[in-house]
């Protein structure tokens, strides 16, 4: 037995107490993430085991299973290989550490068995953007104009999938070429965007995004305006917002049981189908966001500008996520510099007379 517990609780009971208090501290989306991660871990560690019986050896065994074992995929998800990345496993273990530390802080456990366990070493996953040719094939493979418009807006703005689902015409000013991101769709409810920096951010639209939105305007701009409840970060608070959804299943649905707006799962399925029809290498739909960032960086956009567009607090996140990708694309940067700077270079003589 590891340490002396003041009150014997199963690991499930301890986790439930931890989550109950977290409910008032974090946004609903974050709470759902906590719950999902802890549920996965409990299925491995054994929810009926006493929390006080979990030792370092058991935790290392759990970590190994997370790293190498098969995971149960969500509905319609494609799992290409067993295990999880080191970054994901470290995130899971951090959540479990928080549960045990909660137990120590509140007198349920005498000590935290995580002492002496260091995070796994691992590199961040390198973004895997679409090439221009792949993107054209993807768009050509879309079966209706709305799908083409949706993926053009996604790739040329870099907004998150949930933000795309929750986008309303009230948020868009095509005359000034701007879009305000006010909300996100998480699970079955509307929330504020994932980060504080991403909330009410103004996205400056480039021409391909404007063209796609003008095309979509003919399909949905005059549709029904909805009054929706948006859950704020402060516990229990909501705000009513007007929203005429930009992308609507009704426009392209082949069946009648559609909702007023797309879900993250439904646009992911749309992506997977288009990727398969296009005959391009499979990627997750979130790579549409990475494609925007990578294309923008290659085009010479300021990382701080890209960070603002994508809802990051500062350019540091851009360097963290895309730094390795940027270093592996130095040739593109050299080409860009040659294009942009060569015209300003003075003409240099190359005859033998100058060599002295």
Model regions and ranges:
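Catalytic-site neighborhood detector that most strongly recognizes the C-terminal catalytic loop/helix
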Residues: 121, 129, 185, 310-336
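C-terminal secondary-structure termini that scaffold catalytic or DNA-interacting sites
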Residues: 176, 189, 194-211, 215-223, ...
